[in-house]
């Protein structure tokens, strides 16, 4: 009888646990930059053979981040049901590689080093947001590692909607503008 009671109790717990979960939540949305514009690396004045992108620890996750500049300007948030397909640094690196690395014979070419500084959707009001993409880029000589040029970029694009989808699209547009 004792074994039967345990089995009945276990079955009841499983049934209750199944009901306790309630309806399934929203499905997790995974964003990337979509179809890249066509790039022609051959038009570049300097051949690039390698792209290195680094990012600070807070951008080293797939979280789609936003900031409520009008309310909590020092606080970062992440959308619960939306993520990037990869950390922003990886997405930016992939896009830049398509844009600047030309298939060329030989091992020549400079290195492009990029330090991603900011990659977020920023809300200036509850229904108004924009994408903010900031980075420092450095072109390094193929031999010896001497810096040829360096520049800081900050791009902003208005989001079409004040939600994760609008932020992801605006950030993708900012990244495409950087690469183009």
Predicted regions and their residues:
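Short secondary-structure boundary motifs at beta->alpha junctions and helix caps
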Residues: 73-82, 144-180
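Sec-dependent bacterial lipoprotein signal peptides
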Residues: 1-19
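Generic short beta-strand segments
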Residues: 53, 115-120, 154-156
């Amino acid at each position: 009888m004792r074994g039967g009671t345990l089995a009945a109790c276990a079955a009841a717990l499983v049934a209750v646990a199944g009901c306790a979960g309630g309806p399934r939540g929203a499905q997790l949305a995974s964003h990337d930059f979509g179809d890249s514009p066509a790039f022609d690396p051959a038009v570049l004045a300097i051949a690039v053979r390698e792209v290195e992108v680094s990012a600070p620890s807070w951008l080293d996750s797939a979280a789609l981040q936003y900031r409520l500049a009008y309310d909590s300007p020092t606080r970062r948030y992440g959308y619960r049901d939306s993520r990037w397909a990869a950390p922003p640094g990886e997405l930016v690196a992939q896009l830049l590689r398509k844009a600047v690395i030309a298939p060329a014979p030989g091992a020549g070419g400079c290195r492009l080093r990029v330090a991603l500084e900011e990659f977020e959707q920023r809300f200036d009001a509850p229904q108004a947001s924009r994408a903010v993409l900031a980075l420092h880029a450095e072109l390094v000589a193929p031999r010896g590692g001497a810096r040829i040029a360096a520049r800081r970029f900050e791009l902003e694009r208005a989001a079409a909607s004040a939600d994760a989808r609008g932020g992801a699209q605006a950030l993708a547009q900012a990244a495409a503008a950087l690469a183009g």
